[in-house]
């Protein structure tokens, strides 16, 4: 057979594989849609003009008098194609006030439940989602996070390695056509996705990049008249791409970092004379570590998400071996986040298009063979509403089981798992209603 023929056969096989995968994705989505009325108290969807790689609920909530909803704010970006302008964006999202949802209110065509007080037979239940501010941004927004001490201050990771800092109160609602951040943090030589504000010290920021470095920035050293700021510290403790960084929520001097070099490392910024880590572990994951999350309520517990499809749980006092491994995802785990109020609950997103909830208090529970087919005992729930890779997700601090998730195909979803599933009385879960 000629080499040309081999290429044709290979291309044909790839097309067949793609068609098969598409068919599987569509079948899974159909099943999810059928079961959605019983799985969610609310599920609302909107298609963005451009996909966003980043999403984060802002910490405030506005009650609207005599209305069946409250207004929440969401921080998103854009990932445009070709030369289209990118934006840092603030959206208002109107979330229905809590009420007992009726599965009969499910809008099958839209795949939504939990609208504004009317069943699907009345008004259409469209998500009340409105972009209220668009700020010109250079290149796509890899990641955007607000400063905890002042949510108007937002840091963004750019595709050229720069970190931009914005005071959104100093920008108009509509874009001006000029990229005009309040500060530009200069030091990284390649783009990155690791970005974490210190929850303890206003103006302190940690970033990680594909240039293999972690950099610490002190925004309080900024002087008017010069937008450019250099890092106060540069760490070179990783030997490959740094994927994620996080300040410890309870220890102001500790920062966790993870990398393609398959290590988890802990920096102690009190050690001023070193560019190395204070503690590290390697060989516990089998592939790149993509994400890190410290438990906000248990100071020694942290989690890592890996391209080996697993989530590792660790005790900060002994990083030599994992405490436990969570296994159910069928592809790389890309982001993880602890529940803001439930100490034992962790959420994870994966390239398998799913977001999983894990309840660590269930670890080691006995299962029937039938239960084991649905996953390990810790697997509390899987969100299957996306048919494309998930870019980012965020817990809502004002409504503890509400999440926002964004996928690579422009779809943004806001959803709340049914109380029957995540509430204390798990016997209420209508499993007999679910379709296989």
UniProtKB/Swiss-Prot annotation:
One Gene Ontology CC term in the entry: Rpd3L-Expanded complex
Assigned keywords, A-Z: Chromatin regulator, Cytoplasm, Nucleus, Repeat, WD repeat
SUPFAM superfamilies: WD40 repeat-like
Gene3D superfamilies the record matches: YVTN repeat-like/Quinoprotein amine dehydrogenase
Regions crossing the membrane: none
Ranges occupied by WD repeats: 136-176, 187-227, 237-277, 284-324, 328-368, 385-425
GO terms for MF: histone binding
Region span, Interaction with the histone H4 N-terminus: 370-374
Subcellular location, record wording: Cytoplasm; Nucleus
Chief site of localization: cytoplasm
Keyword Coiled coil: no
Biological processes, Gene Ontology terms: chromatin remodeling; regulation of DNA-templated transcription
Assembly information from the UniProt record: Component of the HAT-B complex composed of at least hat1 and hat2. The HAT-B complex binds to histone H4 tail.
Similarity comment: family membership: Belongs to the WD repeat RBAP46/RBAP48/MSI1 family.
General function of this protein: Regulatory subunit of the histone acetylase B (HAT-B) complex. The complex acetylates 'Lys-12' of histone H4 which is required for telomeric silencing.
Name this protein carries in UniProt: Histone acetyltransferase type B subunit 2
Organism of provenance: Aspergillus fumigatus (strain ATCC MYA-4609 / CBS 101355 / FGSC A1100 / Af293) (Neosartorya fumigata)
């Amino acid at each position: 057979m000629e080499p040309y023929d081999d290429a044709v056969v290979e291309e044909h096989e790839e097309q067949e594989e793609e068609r098969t995968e598409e068919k599987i994705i569509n079948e899974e989505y159909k099943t999810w849609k059928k079961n959605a009325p019983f799985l969610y108290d609310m599920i609302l969807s909107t298609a963005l003009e451009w996909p966003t790689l980043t999403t984060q609920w802002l910490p405030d909530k506005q009650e609207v008098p005599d209305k069946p909803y409250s207004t929440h704010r969401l921080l998103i970006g854009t990932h445009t194609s070709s030369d289209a302008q990118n934006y840092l964006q603030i959206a208002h999202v109107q979330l229905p006030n809590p009420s007992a949802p009726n599965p009969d209110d499910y809008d099958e065509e839209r795949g939504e439940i939990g609208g504004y007080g009317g069943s699907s037979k009345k008004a259409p239940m469209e998500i009340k989602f409105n972009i209220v501010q668009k700020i010109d941004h250079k290149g796509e927004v890899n990641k955007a996070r607000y400063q905890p001490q002042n949510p108007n201050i937002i840091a963004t990771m750019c595709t050229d390695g720069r970190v931009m800092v914005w005071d959104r109160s100093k920008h108009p609602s509509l874009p001006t056509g000029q990229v005009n951040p309040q500060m530009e943090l200069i030091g990284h030589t390649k783009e990155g996705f690791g970005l974490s504000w210190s929850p303890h010290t206003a103006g302190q920021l940690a970033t990680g990049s594909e240039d293999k470095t972690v950099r610490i920035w002190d925004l309080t050293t900024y002087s008017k008249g010069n937008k450019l700021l250099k890092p106060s510290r540069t760490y070179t403790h990783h030997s490959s791409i740094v994927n994620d960084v996080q300040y410890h929520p309870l220890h102001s001097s500790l920062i966790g970092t993870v990398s393609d070099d398959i290590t988890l490392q802990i920096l102690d910024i009190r050690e001023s004379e070193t560019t190395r880590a204070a503690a590290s572990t390697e060989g516990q994951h089998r592939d790149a570590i993509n994400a890190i999350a410290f438990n906000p309520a248990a100071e020694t517990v942290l989690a890592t998400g890996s391209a080996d499809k697993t989530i590792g749980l660790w005790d900060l006092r002994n990083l030599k071996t994992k405490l436990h491994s969570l296994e159910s995802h069928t592809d790389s785990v890309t982001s993880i986040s602890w529940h803001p109020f439930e100490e034992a609950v962790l959420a994870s997103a994966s390239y398998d298009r799913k977001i999983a909830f894990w309840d660590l208090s269930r670890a080691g529970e006995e299962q029937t063979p039938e239960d084991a087919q649905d996953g390990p005992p810790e697997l509390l729930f899987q969100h299957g509403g996306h048919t494309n890779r998930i870019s980012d997700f965020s817990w809502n601090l004002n409504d503890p089981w509400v999440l926002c998730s964004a996928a690579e195909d422009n779809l943004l979803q806001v959803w709340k798992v049914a109380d029957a599933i995540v509430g204390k009385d798990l016997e209420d879960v209508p499993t007999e209603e679910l379709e296989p």
